[in-house]
Design a protein with these regions (language model features):
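A structural signal for multi-pass alpha-helical bundles of membrane permease subunits
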Residues: 2-275
């Protein structure tokens, strides 16, 4: 009897928490399909009396979202390629190769994770401005090919450490070199963590607002996040069109996570950072 009461209490709390977490998503969808005058109406109903699907069409035509989508997709795809390539190589060097001071160097590098992006923001901008590469995609893409981020290296290193060393030794006896072992042994066994890092990279770049705002000044180079900000004027905001655009922008992230959910959970568990 006590167990049933405990289970009922747990499920009740979970249902309440689910409703609280789902409410912002519901509010986004509801705002996206009503007219501007009904958003903050005191007689708000759960389902709007009239659903205006034309808001989605208007949201995509009032701003050049096709161009913003291409820009964001280009930045995101190139970042995913760069992060997976460079972070896996760095993680391989810190996990499978044995050299003096390896773990100490890695520990020193991890201290950089304590530095917030705001600390490095101005020095980075000064450097890119000195190179004449502001208002280009270079500051948003090139860093991915030089390490791929310490957190991603950490995730992959933890995963690589769980792979038995005997596999490396067997491949080495068969005549494989270090790079061949990386390509033929380590990467094929690391599908889960590669998907996790790829998903993190996708979300970070797809939803990034700060970095594009700092480096991009031309409308033709705007990303989706900067495009969403165009719905907010000096004296008013088109909230219904903005929420319609937000719903469209969020959709790829939801679909990608649903398809990669299994590998995402497995990768997190096997890297050793689960709760």
């Amino acid at each position: 009897m006590k167990t049933k009461k405990t289970d009922a209490l747990i499920y009740t709390v979970l249902i309440i928490m689910s409703i609280l977490f789902f409410f912002p998503f519901y509010w986004m969808l509801r705002t996206a399909v009503v007219d501007a005058g009904s958003i903050f109406s005191p007689e708000m109903k759960i389902l709007p009396p009239r659903i205006r699907l034309e808001n989605f069409k208007n949201a995509l035509t009032v701003q050049p979202f096709a161009l913003y989508f291409v820009n964001t997709s280009l930045i995101t795809v190139l970042n995913i390629i760069g992060v997976l390539l460079s972070s896996s190589l760095c993680a391989y060097g810190f996990s499978r190769l044995h050299w003096p001071g390896r773990d100490k160097v890695f520990g020193i590098l991890l201290t950089a994770l304590m530095l917030p992006y705001s600390v490095m923001m101005i020095p980075h901008f000064i450097g890119w401005n000195f190179l004449g590469l502001t208002n280009t995609f270079a500051p948003l893409i090139v860093p991915a090919y030089f390490g791929g981020g310490l957190f991603n290296i950490f995730l992959m290193r933890q995963f690589f450490l769980a792979i038995p060393d005997e596999l490396d030794e067997a491949a080495y006896i068969d005549g494989a070199g270090r790079f061949r072992i990386y390509l033929s042994v380590i990467l094929p066994l690391s599908k889960q963590v590669m998907i996790v890092v790829g998903l993190f990279t996708f979300l970070n770049n797809w939803n990034d607002y700060l970095a594009p705002m700092i480096y991009l000044s031309s409308d033709k180079k705007f990303t989706l996040m900067l495009g969403l900000n165009q719905f907010i004027g000096a004296y008013n905001a088109q909230w219904n069109l903005m929420m319609a655009a937000v719903a469209i922008v969020v959709f790829p992230s939801l679909v990608l996570y649903l398809f990669a959910q299994k590998y995402f959970i497995e990768g997190i568990a096997m890297t050793g950072i689960k709760a």
